[in-house]
Structures are given as structure tokens and as C-alpha cells.
Amino acid sequence: MSEIDKSTIDKYINILKSKLDQKKNELLSKINMEYEKTLKQRLDELEKLKGNILKEVQK
């Protein structure tokens, strides 16, 4: 393999790696947003449950 071929191949490999890293970061960001949304929903549910329990205890 000539040096030109190798450098061309390396160039395309680096381009592909960059695109894969970008896609990975996008997916991780979406996963993180969904995770935080789910955690907030759970926290809200627990706070509501806590409020209901406190009302029952105070009766």
C-alpha cells in the first residue's frame, strides 16, 4: 500500500470516528435527558405520596 493510500484511508477513518463520536454524544445526551425526566417524575410522585402520608398521620 502506498503512503498516499494509507493517508487517504487514515483521513476517512478519522472522519468516520468523528461522526461516530458526534452521534454517540447526541444519543448520550438524549438518554441523559430522559433519565433526568424520569427521576424528576419519580421524585414528584414520592413527594406527593409523602404529603398524603403526612396528612393521614396528622388525622
Curated annotation (Swiss-Prot):
Coiled coil: none annotated. Pfam families: ATP-synt_E_2. It catalyses: ATP + H2O + 4 H(+)(in) = ADP + phosphate + 5 H(+)(out). GO terms for biological process: proton motive force-driven ATP synthesis; proton transmembrane transport. Keywords: ATP-binding, Hydrogen ion transport, Ion transport, Nucleotide-binding, Translocase, Transport. Its EC number is 7.1.2.2. One of its GO terms (molecular function) is ATP binding. One of its GO terms (cellular component) is proton-transporting two-sector ATPase complex, catalytic domain. Sul-ATPase is composed of six (or maybe five) subunits: alpha, beta, delta, gamma, C (proteolipid), and possibly epsilon. To E.hirae NtpH. This is Membrane-associated ATPase epsilon chain. The lineage of its organism: Archaea, Thermoproteota, Thermoprotei, Sulfolobales, Sulfolobaceae.
